[in-house]
Amino acid sequence: MRHAGHRLCLGFLLLVSAVPAHAETYRLRYHASLFGLPIGRADFTSILDKNRFEVTGRFASAGIARLFERTDGTVTSKGRLAGSKVVPAAYALDYRSGGKRETTAIRFSGGRIAETVVTPRPKKRGDDWVAVTKADLADAMDPLSALLSPVESAAEVCNRRFKVFDGEMRADIVFSPAGQNEQIRGAAVTCKVRVLPVSGYREGRSTITFLREKARILVAFTPLGAKGHHTPVEALIGTKIGTVHVSGQPVN
């Protein structure tokens, strides 16, 4: 599998989900750690207007993780904002990992996925591959544009479900309110998140089973501006080897 689950998590964690009334630029820097040791970093810039958006980011492995596998990449999503709807136009991911380069480009037409190009071209799939169908892609968005849908209240932040496609995997990302004992300290809103693979994966793979049935993911949001919009600033992501902690800070 071509790191599909990793790309999905990257998409919804490293995103500024604000929609101001006029064009503004927001920059956030994120750091990821495991057992207190740095494993990754990312810088994201979001340009948001009343009728358009563009999100660009650079990410890289860090610390001990970089000793084992050097990863560097960029990701971009752009499109239109039409009232309360997000209409994606293009998504591009370009990264190198372990000396190999992979790229993904998704083109949208009328807000629907029109073309997907992945290089190098994926190898022939086995009988255990759950193929992505045309029906699966209906109303699907890329990982970055998905969370740009505006909300009018904090209560709505944790009551959302997104159809996401990253070029290989189609998954549903489901937000629900976190319990009283699950709140991230200092956060205005904490959501539980489930990533439910729909297609574009190998059946029986332990990573997929863990993601669907056991992964514990919490994401903290904070208000951004005076319009009731929110942005993710912290996350706890359960993995098979431990909990990854992601924290973000504004960059001037």
Q: What residues fall within each predicted segment?
A:
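Bacterial N-terminal signal peptides that target proteins for export
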Residues: 1-9
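Hydrophobic helical h-region of N-terminal Sec-dependent signal peptides
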Residues: 10-14
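Short amphipathic alpha-helical segments, especially helix-boundary/capping motifs
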Residues: 15, 51-56, 120-124
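N-terminal signal peptide c-region/cleavage motif recognized by signal peptidases
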Residues: 17-20
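Acidic, serine/threonine-rich low-complexity disordered tracts
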Residues: 22-110, 152-252
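A charged, solvent-exposed segment within the mature domains of Sec-exported extracytoplasmic proteins
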Residues: 114-177
